[in-house]
Amino acid sequence: ICCNPACGPKYSC
C-alpha cells in the first residue's frame, strides 16, 4: 500500500 498523497492513483491505506 501507499499511504501518501504523492502516490497519486496508487494511494491506498
From Swiss-Prot:
Domain notes: The cysteine framework is I (CC-C-C). Alpha3/5 pattern.
Cleaved signal peptide residues: none
Disulfide bonds: 2-7, 3-13
Localization of this protein: Secreted
InterPro entries: Conotoxin_a-typ_CS
UniProt keyword list: Acetylcholine receptor inhibiting toxin, Amidation, Disulfide bond, Neurotoxin, Postsynaptic neurotoxin, Secreted, Toxin
Residue(s) carrying Cysteine amide: 13
Organism: Conus obscurus (Obscure cone)
Family indicated by similarity: Belongs to the conotoxin A superfamily.
Tissue spec. comment: Expressed by the venom duct.
Domain of life: Eukaryota
Annotated GO MF terms: acetylcholine receptor inhibitor activity; toxin activity
Gene Ontology CC annotation, any one: host cell postsynaptic membrane
Miscellaneous comment: The primary structure of the mature peptide is identical to that of Alpha-conotoxin SI from Conus striatus (AC P15471), with the hypothesis that the first residue is an Ile.
PROSITE patterns in alphabetical order: ALPHA_CONOTOXIN
Tagged with keyword Nucleotide-binding: no
Nucleus listed as a keyword: no
Protein name: Alpha-conotoxin OIB
Described purpose of this protein according to its UniProt entry: Alpha-conotoxins act on postsynaptic membranes, they bind to the nicotinic acetylcholine receptors (nAChR) and thus inhibit them. Is active on muscle nAChR. On mice muscle receptors, its higher affinity site is the alpha/delta nAChR subunit interface. On Torpedo receptors, it does not distinguish between alpha/delta and alpha/gamma acetylcholine-binding sites. In vivo, causes paralysis followed by death when injected into goldfish. In contrast, has no effect on mice, when similar doses are intraperitoneally or intracerebrally injected.
